[in-house]
Curated annotation (Swiss-Prot):
ATP binds at G397, E398, P399, D421, T422, F423, W424, Q425, T426, D512, R528, R539. Mg(2+) binds at V550, V555. NCBIfam families: Ac_CoA_lig_AcsA, PRK00174.1. The lineage of its organism: Bacteria, Pseudomonadati, Pseudomonadota, Betaproteobacteria, Burkholderiales. It comes from Ralstonia pickettii (strain 12J). The gene is acsA. Keywords: Acetylation, ATP-binding, Ligase, Magnesium, Metal-binding, Nucleotide-binding. Belongs to the ATP-dependent AMP-binding enzyme family. Transmembrane segments: none annotated. This is Acetyl-coenzyme A synthetase. GO terms for molecular function: acetate-CoA ligase activity; AMP binding; ATP binding; metal ion binding. Its EC number is 6.2.1.1. It catalyses: acetate + ATP + CoA = acetyl-CoA + AMP + diphosphate.
Amino acid sequence: MAGIESVLQETRVFNPPESFVKQANIAGMDAYRALCAEAEHDYEGFWARLAHEHLLWHKPFSKVLDESNAPFYKWFEDGELNASYNCLERNLENGNADKVAIIFETDDGKVSRTTYRELHARVCRFANGLKALGIKKGDRVVIYMPMSVEGIVAMQACARIGATHSVVFGGFSAKSLQERIVDVGAVALITADEQMRGGKALPLKAIADEALAMEGTDAVKHVIVYRRTNGNVNWVEGRDRAMDEVEAGQPDTCEVTPVSAEHPLFILYTSGSTGKPKGVQHSTGGYLLWALLTMQWTFDLKPDDIFWCTADIGWVTGHSYIAYGPLAAGATQVVFEGVPTYPNAGRFWDMIQRHKVNTFYTAPTAIRSLIKAAEADEKVHPKQYDLSSLRLLGTVGEPINPEAWMWYHTNIGGGRCPIVDTFWQTETGGHMMTPLPGATPLVPGSCTLPLPGIMAAVVDETGHDVPNGQGGILVVKRPWPSMIRTIWGDPERFKKSYFPEELGGKLYLAGDGSIRDKDTGYFTIMGRIDDVLNVSGHRMGTMEIESALVANPIVAEAAVVGRPDDMTGEAICAFVVLKRSRPDGDEAKQIANELRNWVGKEIGPIAKPKDIRFGDNLPKTRSGKIMRRLLRSLAKGEDITQDTSTLENPAILDQLKETR
């Protein structure tokens, strides 16, 4: 791995606008370096100061970091606090009670607003209802819900009473839901009758019933149902209750349950893992601290900002930057039930215009699909909308290709909005590397530098640092407060997955390849380690080849995987979506040849894809991530045996098979 080659050079640099720097929470690189120096000089003192300043403690902590049982690190362990108190009471006490916390827009465009006072009352009523059912501190509650105020209420109510929640994305199958219910040992399930996406009703309660009919789910004594559509659903007497009935008659106040800073706030299962699902366990204190700090640092949050993260609460982004971070920071945020292409592909831009959104945070995949839509239909091009309220853009979920970055910067940000290209993971709890919008000069496609206190590095297979300009394995050298605590019920797997002995057992393995710029030290993520290609002895990250393909003016989106090849060891297989309709026959061969030559010119002959297939789109999860493991199977000509329950567009698999 030490020899991953970087073959794509990016020379464009965009400095933060002076007007942005003047009012930034971290203004200029000197301010960033001062925070980094504070952390370098006194690591525990740095984190202790931030935890004292930014969190409300019921019992102050006396010990900052306990490394005695590494890698099972503990932060602020003897301190006690409550996450819901830090998100809700904090705002009632500091003058935000009548500030709008959530602007919620349904799939079909209905808008409602919930103030902090109203949200607090709803969370308290539901928390009281949970307690009345006998749910208590330490119990695990699975939440299988649509994007909704009710989903956030359910999470906050669990936190309020010390119950650990495990949110399962509403696109998962009954089997996936059952596996998670069993693994986490849930005593209750909170779901909805149906969820609305793109004008279609999807039967959540029916899927939940199917999951609960499978073995191992007997511990679930209560099923609470949010009536989203009032659809006709099966009802089990004594087990099933409507959410509004659980709240009915309960008082608007609910004493919080203080918990240790190390108490598990939630367990979130990582998507795409093979075999037994991997439950990532997060703490309360360290996790909440970082969710709040990154709202202020990365998103430069201001009191009057309208913040919009387009993620789903079923993923970590929806935990940190919808359910917890914005509320702890006292923000007003947009929460959206639907999809970016319904009723048309101008939905996001229309919502930014109507709600006067200031900060917009979305996935590169969404951006790429909306680029294609804008090229195909002038009516949904962002230039048709007033996006002047925007001051900051962000990307999350995967690296963004430089050309998609440029389109986002020009067409959505009007050339004036910094872009925070955030690198982080379910396991890290919050941002790890990202530009700071009022400080960091931006380079398209680079997540730039680690946040203060994050000791990231690039190493070889033995755990030794590699020089800037040479690719290697991305690691973090010191524990940080919001990191994963363990894999639920499987500490050995946790150690092997994240602190492998091959790297000395002390370095956190991110699982990504990375390279640092020779001059600036900026990090670029080169894709997952298992996405590294080895063609005739040359090791290349898939990200660079994808970026080269997307730089071609006819290409909307591309994903690159490897497949075994007798001659070169591994051959490059590219799946490409054009900005126009999908070609076939001789035309497909001709365009494939043009794209091969294009990549050869952009990178070099060694990077030319052997196999190029064209699709109307790519297989993606509903959160917008490309399902590369499915593409690897398609490239090899294998039957698809993996779980495809989160796949947004299953028909695409047959299309991509046929284009071989």
